[in-house]
């Protein structure tokens, strides 16, 4: 099982994973087997407490993120110097990332109890401003939850160590350049068509036909009405408070890459990473969470997204209750808890390349 250094807390440092026995489960246990075992041990009263909604927290966090963005814009407009712009870049960028993580709850319908309100908030206050489509994101992410730890996971390229098993490859991945195209493509009409083709070929080889691009294109643009409207409103807002036209590119578009896409790709890797090659040997161990510092949480994991194992186990739990789930499961040795995203990456970088292991799960 995962080494816990005798403290029975399930907390392990990066790079200290041993493949010995697998949690005492029979046969070739999968990640799904582990998840099922953990869920079965949770009583209904505890689960009911975890699921308790507090909608005011959502409104508070949305207001905080947008209020912070507004203050940063006004600050840049008032001082109009490079220090103000640099500060606004990061304040706006990490506020955008906070919004993006709140949107993750909307994907699971846990942002608001009313599903229509849930999607309305997500489309107009989160996904539209960030150039994203809620339905495409939901389709991809729910498939990730369904297939995590298998070759069918649409996000597997993010978690895999097999294609990052050198210092150069890991560094290139951490720039975002290695995965940007794949991440954009999978929620595009072309990616949707390819996923449909792959699924069809698995069920009935040679029978892929009758699914062109017209339907995916129509769905793609209909989802992004909020994108077009919100970008116009944002441009008007930048100009109305006295910011130059290029500030929209520098203070809104650029941070989406550097403060949203890039940290989220790195976080997604770390939150599923296991120091084993090949990936099939690592798959049963992908219940990973982090307990980062406040600064690291701001950069990589706002709104409790660092409790990623807990989220995968109980995706219906709202983000603001995940710390409670973490406290209740902190002694579960099936969950690997790492302390620092940066610390993990540094230790992993020093260990690369990893040798291929022989495992009954590969």
Model-predicted regions and their roles:
Residues 119, 123-127, 278-290:
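Membrane-cytosol interface motif
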Residues 102-121, 149-159:
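Aspartate-rich (DDxxD/NDxxD/DxxxD) Mg2+/diphosphate-binding motifs
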Residues 99-108, 137-149, 268-274, 301-317:
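Histidine-centered catalytic micro-motifs
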Residues 72, 107, 111-112, 279, ...:
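Active-site-flanking alpha-helical
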Residues 1-93, 127-250, 319-362:
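Non-catalytic, topology-defining segments of multipass membrane proteins
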Residues 91-103, 133-135, 181-186, 252-280:
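Transmembrane alpha-helical segments that form the membrane-embedded catalytic/substrate-channel core
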Residues 210-212, 285-304:
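Cytosolic juxtamembrane regulatory segments of multi-pass membrane proteins
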